[in-house]
Amino acid sequence: MSWPRELDVVVGERRIRVRDAGDPEGTPVVFFHGLGDSRLDLRLGEPLAEQLQVRLVSFDRPGYGNSTAAEFGLLSVARDIEAVADQLHVERFAVLGQSAGSRFALAAAVALGERVTCAGCASGSGPVREVGNAMDEFDRTDQAAYELLPHDPAAAARVYAAAFEPLARTIAEGDDDDVVAAFEALLSAADLALLADPLIRADAVANARESVRQGVDGMAWDAVSWLASWPFTVRDVTCPVHLWYGSQDTTPLTHAAWLAENLPQAVLRVWPGEGHLAYKRHLDEMWTVLVACHRA
């Protein structure tokens, strides 16, 4: 068997593209990428995963990378991961979400019960309808989509798709400088300093391009999942949850505080002077914590 490997898991008439890397005999950690990312997001960390005895399972949500485009929400993605774990013969595992992926990681912890041993959330947001002042972050696109929920999520997704098209076109057709420039307004000074590393920069650009291989449907439904009411309460997350943020994070730390207060078993860590991409610097810490939590 070649390693790392990529495979498709079939769910109904859809395929889910999966990347299986790290130590094949290690502690399984299922990774949920952020909005505008893909299963390739942690490729640079795969040698470290192997060293730390982590089996790193990453996948594209519907419409991203090589996964079939489809409407999706928090619980449907959790069921997709159940199918992935079944095909990989992984019974119990930890989950790790970055940014938008964090809410999907928490949904998996609720939906899959004891199969999820512990969860990690890097720069994740809480439910916008519950976190104080979260709606103050809305721009015109968010407001237009919000007014369509909960009655017409497909229309809300179309609103976001139209808004994301120019960015996706730049990512798909522009050179590396164009791609990085397109994200500058969304990142902190700490994040831009991290992207000054040529290896990290090239990897981030390749990951972004993979995310829009099929267009913007994946990003659009991710955005809808951010606006929509969560189909569970965070108090239903019974496993331990580790929360990581940068002090310069573009996810407001009010979300970190809300999650830390409302999750039954939460541990919050804020990295001083770091931003939304801080997880790329701290994989060693995060995986070490999740492995210990999984084995406890």
Region spans (language model):
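N-terminal cap/lid segment of alpha/beta-hydrolase-fold proteins
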Residues: 1-20
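Conserved HGGG/HGGXW glycine-rich cap/lid loop of the alpha/beta-hydrolase fold
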Residues: 17-66
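Conserved acidic catalytic loop of the alpha/beta-hydrolase fold
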Residues: 76-94
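Conserved hydrolase catalytic core segment
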Residues: 92-135
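Alpha/beta-hydrolase
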Residues: 140-232
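Short beta-strand/loop motif that positions the catalytic acidic residue
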Residues: 237, 243-245
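Conserved alpha/beta-hydrolase "acid-adjacent" motif
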Residues: 250-255
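Catalytic active-site module of serine/aspartate enzymes centered on a nucleophile-bearing elbow/loop
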Residues: 265-296
